[in-house]
Regions:
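Intrinsic low-complexity, intrinsically disordered segments enriched in polar/basic residues
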Residues: 284, 347-348
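Core active-site phosphate/anionic-ligand binding loop and the adjoining beta-turn-alpha structural block
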Residues: 272
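Glycoside hydrolase catalytic-domain groove-lining segments
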Residues: 117, 277-337
Length: 507
């Protein structure tokens, strides 16, 4: 049913002020070192005209991976486009970080590690973080090469990367002990590692950080947890429950709950963190069919509502394990685990991306670390060429227009009307709205209280378009990698938001 929205900006109640670094991103450790990551889709698979064949799971996770050379963090285009996003947290972590050896003296990598980080690679990464005005966050190694499960974790490797980063003028300002400790088997941890071993070692690590790098913020546990995600504090079931899966990827992969990992720890977290994806991509759909959403569901209420529901579910965990009422950080987020859906690099992903940012900010203060900046199909920039994808321009517009004070929009979330309201990012009096029309067929009408600037986003020829239109003009880089002008158009009276359209309205 077509929706009609009447904007009433002068009557809205503020909800909270949010972290100006709400929109941040991941650079996977395996990108820095070079290594395996998710296999790229074919052009036909991205277009939706070719099916993704199920991998041969008898070969393990490697059946879904391919080799990638190290990312060039000195690339001028990469630095320019990342800098345009403004100040962000840059998280260097991921599954591969747990088995990465910091070979800063050039002596080579011993047994028990998997990825090999050279000094110059880390120097380049730190220079990148400084060049883009970012803040550095990492997780550290915790594998057989460092210690066995019955031996306590030791800081011999962590000290190297903390000290080098500080020497380079790019201190590690936030840290998680390890990445996704809910999956203790077959992801890099010492053989036979248990939740009790994790609790022991996390306490050792956190105490060590506080004693030696007291300015560093301690974040954790960086996990997924189906128990936490199934029902929120008000008793509402997860939106995916109707489809037979209460927590998608988390339900299939979480071997330890948040309680298993945290109950009994003596070192309290500064900030509570978790990971969240909208299920799994086509790469893992055959293994986890109930966690996969087909393209036809990418604008459904269940699909779009899952991010805010998950944030509400974790509020009580934040209050228990970190600062009550404090920030929550989603230290990995994206459209789908296992590298993103086939449509992750297209306009269709803009709807989910903007909806997640808007809805998360209505639930809590915090930071969302998008996975990734420039790797795999869910990257904001295309791997290798660093061409900006539609979602890059979408988050760039959010940062340009939406301020850090969040208001209750006064509009119930419903098909055709996902409405979010903030103050203006330019500091001028007024409000900035985002209206997402997640209907496939019906146009949404918006009644304006006065003249406004309109920034209407649509696909360039369809939802799976590789490029996006702003007020009918294609967004792409110009000569010398110049950004396109991101200008609004004046409107008054009423405007229409096309099916699948996302429109920013600045009053």
């Amino acid at each position: 049913m077509a929706q009609h929205i009447k904007l009433t900006p002068d009557t809205l109640n503020p909800l909270r002020s949010i972290n100006p670094m709400l929109i941040s991103y991941n650079v996977e450790t395996t990108e820095i070192t070079g290594g395996t990551f998710w296999k790229a889709y074919t052009d036909a698979q991205i277009d939706g005209t070719e099916q993704v064949p199920p991998p041969d799971f008898s070969k393990g996770m490697g059946a879904m991976h391919q080799w990638y050379d190290p990312i060039d963090t000195t690339n001028p285009r990469l630095i320019k486009l990342a800098k345009e996003l403004g100040s962000c947290w840059v998280r260097v972590s991921g599954t591969w970080a747990t088995r990465t050896y910091y070979d800063f003296d050039g002596t080579g990598m011993p047994e028990g590690y998997f990825n090999h980080l050279r000094k110059q690679q880390w120097v380049n990464l730190c220079n990148f973080v400084k060049a883009v005005g970012g803040k550095l966050k990492i997780s550290v190694a915790n594998c057989d090469g460092l210690h066995s499960h019955d031996e306590p974790w030791n800081p011999s490797q962590a000290k190297l990367i903390f000290d080098l980063s500080r020497e380079l003028g790019c201190p590690i300002e936030a840290v998680e002990f390890v990445n996704e400790p809910n999956m203790l088997q077959n992801t890099g941890f010492p053989k036979d590692y248990t939740a009790a071993d994790f609790r022991r070692d996390q306490d050792i690590f956190h105490k060590w950080v506080r004693e030696n790098y007291p300015e560093c913020t301690i974040v954790g546990p960086s996990d997924t947890d189906p128990n936490a995600m199934s029902v929120d504090a008000d008793g509402n079931p997860h939106p995916w429950a109707a489809g037979g899966d209460t927590a998608g990827i988390a339900a299939a992969l979480a071997y330890c709950s948040t309680g298993d990992l945290m109950d009994g720890c003596t070192e309290k977290l500064d900030i509570f963190s978790y990971h969240y994806y909208n299920g799994v991509s086509e790469r893992m759909a055959a293994m986890m069919p109930s966690a996969f959403t087909p393209f036809e569901g990418c604008m459904s209420e269940a699909y779009l509502g899952a991010a805010a529901h998950t944030a509400r579910c974790f509020l009580s965990y934040r209050d228990k394990y970190a600062a009550p009422g404090g920030e929550m950080w989603v230290t990995e987020s994206g459209d789908a685990g296992a590298g993103g859906h086939t449509w992750a690099s297209t306009y269709a992903e803009v709807i989910r991306t903007l909806n997640e940012i808007g809805s998360f900010a209505t639930v809590t203060d915090g930071v969302i670390f998008h996975n990734t900046l420039a790797s795999s199909d869910y990257g904001w920039l295309k791997h290798g060429s660093f061409d900006p994808r539609p979602s890059y321009f979408a988050v760039l517009l959010w940062k340009k227009l939406m301020g850090n004070t969040v208001f209750d929009s006064g509009e119930a979330i419903r098909t055709g009307a996902h409405v979010f309201c903030h103050d203006r990012a330019d500091g001028k009096a007024g409000k900035a709205y985002l209206v997402i029309n997640n209907s496939w067929t019906d146009t949404t009408t918006v009644e304006l209280p006065k003249e406004a600037e309109i920034y209407a986003l649509t696909g360039n020829g369809g939802m799976r378009s590789r490029t996006m239109l702003l007020n009918g003009i294609e967004l792409k880089l110009g000569e010398g990698d110049a950004l396109p002008e991101l200008n609004g158009v004046a409107a008054k009276g009423t405007i229409e938001v096309a099916p699948g359209g996302c429109t920013f309205i600045v009053l």
